Regions:
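Zinc-dependent metallohydrolase catalytic domains
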Residues: 89-96, 368-380, 384-398, 411-577
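N-terminal mature-domain "stem" immediately C-terminal to a signal peptide or N-terminal signal-anchor/transmembrane
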Residues: 39-126, 130
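Fold-level signature of zinc-dependent metallopeptidase catalytic domains
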Residues: 49-61, 66-78, 169-423, 427-431, ...
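Bacterial N-terminal signal peptides
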Residues: 18-32
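N-terminal intrinsically disordered, low-complexity regulatory regions
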Residues: 93, 99-101, 108-218, 226, ...
Length: 577
């Protein structure tokens, strides 16, 4: 049920509200009008669309269905249809006005319009992810609350409305609500800001989406996967993902798998709690998946090795850590737009972590593209030749695997409470968690080397691959969570002498002797920030370290011909509306 301001203003009657309260509504109305005042048909467009698009490498992601049965092909088609509907919701969360413009350009044959449309698709809206979210359409800055909140909403105003009893805190901070103007009351006798649950706000898309999942379940030859799809269909219509997340964790080496839920909070720059919908339809790579089995058995010992007191480590946590190497057949939502993930650790629900653990997914087709088209060329450009050749796809995969494992390690809640770490830290949480996973993951690499699980001679290869990947990530800018995390890490490690720049060659190199101690020190700091939930400490830390030095910016600029990311081109193109 939506929560809202509780004053009544019957339609057709004189509003009985105070002047202050009237101004509150007027403020929202004016803000909304301002946000929507610019016609999507005649926007001011950045003149350098071609240059912006050139920063992305188009990569075909073909799907070989020749080995599938007819039923499997039909099942995949149903899942793609569902993902297309999910993408429509994501656009409304990310940039509703950008969606209008994107749809309006669909039939245009104008090359400029098609370039603009592609850039809108890449970014999921009008704001350039690798230019600190500055607009390339119009001049209005990106609202920190995106489409989750009313235009010009602020954290201070929301907290004030909560304290006055006009909003329920649980609704404001729910991962599955969106702020809108609602008709409220038994007879819809008044209007006002409210927080509507996703399943109500997006029902026009979620209902047919759930039906597609049910039809896909009927076509599946895997009973466990079919059961999961049915439970996930129910979850889409209730916003209760717990039962289906449990079923997802119980899947054993499925041939097909999906990510299909609002999981990540990267888009919410206002509160850092609203989840955006994302989807990936995947087919398992058995040979590569079997190679990861070694890592799974060490997870409990890796957790125990963390530099935290026992009271800040989970007393109970499911240690089930399934790992799947897959190829993406199709992706949608926050897995299609923006930063192209090569791995994920899901679900994010701490209750699932306690009861079951978490699943690590590695998209091989995306990792191969990232390494070949971005990381290796960038390493050759920024690192001395003897270290650049140490950057490898295998070293990058090891780093990525331990990164994802480390998302599931460390504090589950703020020390001494059941308060979520994300709620406590706020918008900076996404960057903090990405940095924690990076650095704790590298600590885990050292532990595995020390205990003979990884050959000693591999350690420096993984350190070099870590730096090569870090250079790739900071090109997204510090407004993006992964970019902010990587910039902070490089700054701190440079301060500790573990990374150093040679001014004569302008190359950046790893000091392999200093790296372990510097990594351990940084891991301790980041884990303590999560354990304490100290928002000011985290904000000040990133304010100090997530700053691009001019000399690094200049070095990156010289490599402008190297793509920043890949732009996947799938065999499927469901319509967006």
């Amino acid at each position: 049920m939506a929560t809202t301001i509780t004053r009544h203003t019957k339609r057709g009657s004189v509003p009985r509200v105070s002047a202050v309260f009237f101004l509150f509504f007027a403020w929202f109305a004016i803000a909304a009008a301002t946000a929507y005042s610019q016609s999507p048909q005649k926007p001011v467009i950045a003149p350098d669309l071609a240059a912006r698009l050139a920063k992305y490498k188009p990569v075909k992601m073909p799907f070989d269905s020749s080995h599938l049965s007819d039923r499997e092909k039909q099942m995949v088609a149903k899942l793609v249809d569902a993902a297309g509907l999910l993408d429509c919701i994501f656009w409304r969360q990310s940039d509703p006005e950008g969606l209008k413009l994107y749809v309006s350009l669909a039939d245009s044959k104008n090359p400029q319009d098609q370039m603009l449309r592609e850039l809108l698709k890449i970014n999921g809206g009008r704001f350039d992810q690798i230019d600190d979210e500055k607009p390339f359409v119009g001049t209005d800055p990106m609202p920190p609350g995106r489409g989750f909140f009313l235009p010009h909403e602020t954290r201070a105003n929301l907290e004030q409305q909560i304290s006055r009893g006009r909003f329920e805190k649980s609704a404001v901070y729910s991962p599955y609500t969106i702020e809108k103007i609602c008709a409220i009351g038994t007879d819809a006798e008044y209007y006002g800001p409210c927080f509507d649950p996703y399943h109500a706000a997006f029902g026009d898309f979620l209902n047919p989406m759930a039906e597609d999942l049910r039809e896909a379940a009927a076509l599946s030859d895997d009973p466990a996967f079919a059961k999961f799809l049915l439970l996930r269909a129910d979850a889409l219509l209730s916003d209760d993902y717990y039962p289906s997340d449990l079923a997802w964790m119980d899947l054993e080496n499925p041939k097909f798998d999906v990510v299909f839920a609002p999981y990540e909070v990267y888009l919410d720059g206002l509160l850092g709690v609203k989840t955006s919908y994302g989807a990936s339809i995947m087919i398992r790579n058995d040979a590569e998946s079997q190679k990861l089995a070694m890592f799974q058995k060490y997870v409990p010992e890796l957790e125990e090795s963390l530099p935290l007191p026992p009271e800040d480590l989970p007393s109970e946590r499911g240690k089930h850590q399934p790992m799947e190497v897959v190829d993406a057949i199709y992706r949608a939502g926050d897995l299609l737009h923006g930063y192209q993930a090569v791995a994920d650790n899901l679900p994010n629900d701490p209750r699932i972590h306690v009861e079951k653990g978490s699943k690590k997914i590695f998209w091989k087709n995306f990792l191969d593209a990232r390494v070949n088209f971005v990381i290796l060329p960038l390493a050759e450009h920024l690192m001395p030749p003897e270290q650049a050749k140490m950057v490898t796809g295998e070293g990058t995969l090891d780093f990525v695997v331990l990164h994802e494992i480390s998302h599931g390690l460390g504090p589950t809640y703020v020390h001494g409470s059941k308060r979520g770490i994300g709620e406590a830290i706020g918008p900076q949480y996404s960057a903090l968690e990405e940095a924690k996973a990076d650095i704790t993951g590298m600590m885990c690499v050292k532990w595995l080397v020390d205990h003979g699980a990884i050959p000693k001679e591999k350690l420096n290869e993984i350190y070099a691959s870590f730096l090569g990947d870090g250079f790739r990530t900071i090109r997204f800018g510090i407004a993006e969570a992964h970019g902010a995390a990587a910039m902070m890490e490089i700054s701190y490690l440079s301060e500790r002498g573990a990374i150093h720049r040679d001014p004569s060659t302008e190359f950046y190199a790893v000091d392999f002797q200093k790296m372990p101690a510097a990594m351990a020190s940084l891991a301790k700091e980041l884990l303590e920030q999560e354990a304490t939930g100290d928002r000011a400490r985290t904000e000040n830390w990133f304010k100090k370290y997530a700053v691009m030095p001019p000399e690094l910016a200049a070095a990156l600029a010289k490599g402008s011909d190297i793509p920043v990311d890949v732009d996947p081109d799938f065999d499927f193109h469901p319509p967006v509306r």
